[in-house]
UniProtKB/Swiss-Prot annotation:
Transforms N(2)-succinylglutamate into succinate and glutamate. GO terms for molecular function: hydrolase activity, acting on ester bonds; succinylglutamate desuccinylase activity; zinc ion binding. InterPro entries: AspA/AstE_fam (IPR050178), AstE_AspA_cat (IPR055438), Aste_AspA_hybrid_dom (IPR007036), SuccinylGlu_desuccinylase (IPR016681). It comes from Paraburkholderia xenovorans (strain LB400). GO terms for biological process: arginine catabolic process to glutamate; arginine catabolic process to succinate. It holds the Pfam family AstE_AspA_cat. The active site is at 222. Binds 1 zinc ion per subunit. The keyword Zinc applies. Keywords: Arginine metabolism, Hydrolase, Metal-binding, Zinc. Belongs to the AspA/AstE family. Succinylglutamate desuccinylase subfamily. This is Succinylglutamate desuccinylase.
C-alpha cells in the first residue's frame, strides 16, 4: 500500500502522483477498503456493508484556492486509515479542481462550480470542462450503488468565501422542487452553521447536480475565508468537521443544536455588459442588509432596486463575465421555512 496516499492525500494529489494498478486499492484499519479512482478521487468503504447504510460524498477544492476544507478532508482520510475516525457507510472523497489547487488559484479558465449539470458541454474549450464531466461521472457511479432511500445519499461540498460575511459560516441548499429536508437542517445545526441560503431555481453547482441527478441530500458549505495552504486555523472549522465525522460514523442526530436561520433567494443581479456597476463597497460582507428603494446596481438602462423592506446581498462580484451572476438577493424566511421541513 502506498502509505503516503492515505497519510497525506493532499500532498499525494498535489504531486500529481498516479498509483500503479496494483497499488490503487487496499485495506486499512478496521478492514476499511479503499480505492484510488482518479486524480483527487478516493473511495472508502467499511468492511461490513449493511443494507440501507449511508453513502456520503464529501468534496472540497472545487475552487482551487479554498484550502481549509481541502486540508480537513486530507486529515479525515488519514484518520479513517489509522482507525481514529469511524466509517459505517460508503465515503467518496473528492478534491475538485486539482489543477487550480496546484496553481494556487480559484480556476484556470472558468468557475468549475458553474459547469455542472451538463453546462460544461457549452464550453468544450475550457480547461475545467473535462474535470466537470469527470466529477459528474464519479458522483453518478457512486450514488448508483447506493440505496434510493430517504437520507441514504448525502453530498457535503465544502468551500470558503472570498469575502467576509455577516454569518461567518453558512450553507446553500439546491432547488429540487421538493420540500427541504429536516434531517439536513438538523445536521447543519450540528455543524454550527448559522444561516442557510435556499435556492429557488436550478443551478449548475456540484451540489445542484448531485441533488437533481443523483437524488442526494446535498449542500454547499461556506466555512470562512480563503487562505493559502498551511495558513488556516482549522479549529475555526471544528463544527463542520465534527458533524461530517458524526455523519460518517452513523451518529447524526445525537447532538441537538439550534436550527440555522433561513434566507430565500428572491432575485439575482446579473452583469449584462462591460458598463455594469455594482453600487456597494468593494469589501461589502455577504448577507449585508439593504433597505427598500436602495439602488444596488446599474448597467445601461438596467437598475436593481430593493423591493422588500429588507433584502440581503450575497456573493457580490462586479468582475464576473457578462451574462453571469454578480450577486444574489435574499430575504429571511426562517419561520415559514422551518414550519415546512419534511
Amino acid at each position: 500500500m502506498p502509505v503516503s496516499l492515505l497519510d497525506d492525500f493532499l500532498a499525494y494529489t498535489l504531486a500529481g502522483t498516479r498509483p500503479a494498478a496494483s497499488e490503487a486499492q487496499g485495506t486499512c484499519a478496521g478492514g476499511v477498503r479503499w480505492s484510488w479512482l482518479d486524480d483527487g478521487v478516493l473511495l472508502m468503504e467499511p468492511a461490513v456493508q449493511e443494507e440501507g447504510m449511508r453513502s456520503v460524498l464529501v468534496s472540497a477544492g472545487v475552487h482551487g484556492d479554498e484550502t481549509a476544507p481541502i486540508e480537513l478532508l486530507a486529515f479525515l482520510v488519514r484518520d479513517i486509515a489509522h482507525g481514529t475516525a469511524a466509517l459505517t457507510g460508503r465515503l467518496l472523497v473528492i478534491l475538485g479542481n486539482v489543477d487550480a489547487m496546484r496553481d494556487a488559484c480559484r480556476y484556470r479558465d472558468d468557475d468549475l462550480n458553474r459547469l455542472f449539470s451538463g453546462r460544461h458541454l457549452q464550453l468544450p474549450q475550457s480547461h475545467e470542462a473535462p474535470r466537470a464531466a469527470a466529477l459528474e461521472r464519479a458522483a453518478t457511479r457512486f450514488f448508483a450503488a447506493a440505496p434510493d432511500n430517504p437520507g441514504a445519499r448525502w453530498h457535503i461540498d465544502m468551500h470558503t468565501a472570498i469575502r467576509a460575511s455577516a454569518f461567518e459560516q453558512f450553507a446553500l441548499l439546491p432547488h429540487t422542487g421538493k420540500p427541504f429536508s429536516r434531517a439536513m437542517f438538523e445536521w447543519l445545526g450540528e455543524a454550527r452553521i448559522s444561516a442557510v441560503l435556499l435556492h429557488t431555481t436550478r443551478g449548475n453547482t456540484y451540489s445542484h447536480f448531485t441533488a437533481q441527478a443523483c437524488g442526494a441530500l446535498a449542500c454547499t458549505l461556506e466555512l470562512g475565508k480563503v487562505r493559502p495552504f498551511g495558513q488556516n486555523d482549522l479549529t475555526r472549522f471544528a463544527g463542520a468537521d465534527h458533524a461530517v465525522r458524526h455523519l460518517l460514523a452513523g451518529m447524526r442526530g445525537e447532538v441537538r443544536a439550534p436550527m440555522p436561520r433561513a434566507f430565500t433567494v428572491i432575485d439575482q443581479i446579473t452583469r449584462q455588459s462591460e458598463a455594469f456597476e455594482l453600487l456597494v463597497a468593494p469589501d461589502v460582507a455577504n448577507f449585508t442588509p439593504f433597505a427598500k428603494d436602495t439602488v444596488l446596481a446599474r448597467d445601461g438602462d438596467y437598475r436593481y432596486v430593493v423591493r422588500h423592506d429588507e433584502e440581503r446581498l450575497v456573493f457580490p462580484n462586479a468582475t464576473v463575465k457578462p451574462g453571469l451572476r454578480a450577486g444574489l438577493m435574499v430575504i429571511e424566511t426562517t419561520q415559514d421555512t422551518l414550519s415546512k421541513l419534511v
